[in-house]
């Protein structure tokens, strides 16, 4: 219907690039004198927040084998929105070399891809340590350079904008039950 098949994995590469931002986050547990007890790498995976909350809540019996360790982060793509403010002419093209010949390439269509990053922790201080390691890089955006279309060598600087941070703590439930 629309034309010739193509798949440059642009959305996939964008998702991977977003996740890579949060790969190397650690937290530390310290004694009151400042001595480090634990240096913990925070796990990261792609998937919806509700999936991880359900898994964590299934672990009510603490003697069971560990299925998810906390703290942990998950992220997911939650929207794709057209951005008319970045629109260029429909027929505008640019030339790109693929090593042997020049190719005529149409301008990309501007879309904003929304993500949600969720942080799960047993201790409030763990969550605050994670947030404090993320916030300074976003003022309010952080720019990633992504190799979007390898066939033509198209690399783009993609700004990742931190819109807001919201907190959710489940205070409901039985006394003695772990809260996430």
Give the location of each predicted region:
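Short, charged/polar micro-motifs that form catalytic or ligand-binding hotspots
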Residues: 1-8, 116-125
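Small/polar-rich, solvent-exposed N-terminal microdomains that initiate assembly or binding
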Residues: 1-92
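Short, well-ordered alpha-helical segments
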Residues: 13, 17, 126-137
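Catalytic micro-motifs at enzyme active sites that drive phosphoryl/nucleotidyl and oxygen chemistry
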Residues: 60-65, 99-107, 169-174
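Oligomerization/assembly interface segments of phage tail-like spikes and tubes
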Residues: 71-79, 107-123, 132-134, 176-179
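Short, solvent-exposed secondary-structure capping/transition elements
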Residues: 83-86, 124-131, 143-147
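Active-site-proximal segments of catalytic enzyme domains
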Residues: 87-90, 95-105, 110
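Acidic-leaning, charged glycine-interspersed low-complexity segments
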Residues: 107-109, 129, 136-179
């Amino acid at each position: 219907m629309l034309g010739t098949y193509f798949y440059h994995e642009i959305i996939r590469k964008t998702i991977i690039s977003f996740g890579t931002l949060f790969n190397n986050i650690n937290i530390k547990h310290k004694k009151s004198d400042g001595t480090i007890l634990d240096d913990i790498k925070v796990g990261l995976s792609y998937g919806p927040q509700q999936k991880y909350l359900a898994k964590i809540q299934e672990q009510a019996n603490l003697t069971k084998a560990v299925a998810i360790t906390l703290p942990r982060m998950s992220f997911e793509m939650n929207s794709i929105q057209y951005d008319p403010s970045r629109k260029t002419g429909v027929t505008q093209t640019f030339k790109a070399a693929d090593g042997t010949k020049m190719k005529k390439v149409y301008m990309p269509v501007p879309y904003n891809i929304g993500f949600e990053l969720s942080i799960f922790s047993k201790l409030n201080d763990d969550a605050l340590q994670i947030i404090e390691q993320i916030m300074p890089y976003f003022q309010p955006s952080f720019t990633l350079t992504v190799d979007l279309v390898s066939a033509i060598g198209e690399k783009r600087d993609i700004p990742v904008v931190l819109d807001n941070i919201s907190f959710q703590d489940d205070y409901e439930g039985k006394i003695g039950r772990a809260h996430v």
